[in-house]
């Protein structure tokens, strides 16, 4: 049960284990799932947020239903690379999930993925597809989750999660030392 970098997450997956991408918003959680070969991300749904416990139960059910073993969670880093309140909220949600393995029936693992501009990119694509505003509003969160997960899958296929890319390798306390506190705090 840990927060890992992307390559460690892949190494910990059981054979044919799937990943689920999350786009955590204030009102909804967009969900996407990978194929067993970790090549393609598909949008699968949205959870309307209520209370953490209910959100976590719905997420656990979605993971079990799709044989998902680990999560790639979009981290809304500021444009200058700093982490603001939204990142703190995402990290806290992830930390709380990891404290409840009984919900999942296994110990889930999480990797963060820099999601800067993911929703904007998805909205531009959907406008290009001539989707109505109403339809875009209905699917934007799960499409953003698929965009986030696909970026992570593409990185995994490259076999390189080196610092400087989009793979956020910071641990729970925001540094890269793998320990609680006392790290460099710098990330990449």
Swiss-Prot record:
Top EC category: hydrolase
Lineage start: Bacteria, Pseudomonadati, Pseudomonadota, Alphaproteobacteria, Rhodospirillales
Annotated GO CC locations: cytosol
SUPFAM superfamilies: Ribonuclease H-like (SSF53098)
Protein name: Putative pre-16S rRNA nuclease
InterPro entries, A to Z: RNaseH-like_sf (IPR012337), YqgF (IPR005227), YqgF/RNaseH-like_dom (IPR006641), YqgF/RNaseH-like_dom_sf (IPR037027)
Composition bias, Acidic residues: 166-188
Region described as Disordered: spans on this chain: 156-188
E.C. designation(s): 3.1.-.-
């Amino acid at each position: 049960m840990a927060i890992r970098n992307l390559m460690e997450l892949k190494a910990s997956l059981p054979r044919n284990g799937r990943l689920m991408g999350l786009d955590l918003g204030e009102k909804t959680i967009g969900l996407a799932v990978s194929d067993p070969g970790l090549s393609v991300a598909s949008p699968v749904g949205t959870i309307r947020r209520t209370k953490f416990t209910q959100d976590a139960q719905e997420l656990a059910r979605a993971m079990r239903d799709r044989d998902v073993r680990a999560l790639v969670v979009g981290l809304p880093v500021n444009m200058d690379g700093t982490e603001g309140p939204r990142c703190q909220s995402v990290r806290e949600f992830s930390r709380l999930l990891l404290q409840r393995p009984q919900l999942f029936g296994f110990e889930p693992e999480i990797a963060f993925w820099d999601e800067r501009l993911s929703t904007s990119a998805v909205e531009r694509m959907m406008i290009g597809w001539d989707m109505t505003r109403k339809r875009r509003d209905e699917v934007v969160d799960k499409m953003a989750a698929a965009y986030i997960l696909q970026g992570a899958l593409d990185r995994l296929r490259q076999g390189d999660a080196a610092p400087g890319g989009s793979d956020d390798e910071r641990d729970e306390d925001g540094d890269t030392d793998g320990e609680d506190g006392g790290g460099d705090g710098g990330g990449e």
